[in-house]
């Protein structure tokens, strides 16, 4: 159940909401399947499909935002609209105008929507009240923005801010590579992206490739900066840090898997054990990563 991505946030004031209070607030914006004429619906769903919108273990909270979207390709709508427009032109003797075409397209969309397939996407949120972390499991900023918007809507007021650090990820990652020295507790892995600041945006990528410090220094001397860097924290968690301070490709390593609680009797107990371990490890990793980036900068 480990998160694969971390869009990291902090609280500008101590977290004060209980799980029951969060549950009650989310319930006002709970997910319900859309009608046949709705293109998209969105709301909070149970992370464990047990009716509870907040899953809590040891004070750690897990939320799930569910999005249901109809798959209605624009090409299909345009194709049917053009066919209808041709019929209208034949009947009235001239092509439909812009306003008529717009109305026709809306009519076609309404007719096709009930027959469109629906897909659901769940985006998870982890809240660590004690250490002040909130992370969204989303690789794309746009998806994280959706979640943030729904959080602010449900938990108003919510003292949520982006994590700010004293040294930019680009400057720090470039410095680590130039000096061939990762910060304490971290190692550099075999995935790197270096990008030029020039208009050409010339880019060099290493993927599962041995790193030559001299080659890296030459690229850096030529003006390229590190925008993506794979790292491992304490031989326990691997990840990729991006220039936007998004943590991607998060994965527990074997040492954590070996420490997993083998006494769990059922799926629910295993899930809770995994969630507890994930929260503990990622909280420690985020704290160390923040320090490696010069510490937290208060907004």
UniProtKB/Swiss-Prot annotation:
UniProt keyword Cytoplasm present: yes
GO terms, molecular function: double-stranded DNA binding
Organism the protein comes from: Cupriavidus necator (strain ATCC 17699 / DSM 428 / KCTC 22496 / NCIMB 10442 / H16 / Stanier 337)
Protein purpose: May be involved in recombination.
Compartments, record wording: Cytoplasm, Nucleoid
Domain of life per record: Bacteria
Protein name: Recombination-associated protein RdgC
Pfam families per UniProt: RdgC
Gene Ontology cellular component terms for the protein in this record: bacterial nucleoid; cytoplasm
Family recorded in the similarity comment: Belongs to the RdgC family.
Alphabetical GO biological process terms: DNA recombination; regulation of DNA recombination
The UniProt record lists the keyword Lyase: no
NCBIfam families tied to this protein: PRK00321.1-4, PRK00321.1-5
Keywords: Cytoplasm, DNA recombination
Gene that encodes the chain: rdgC
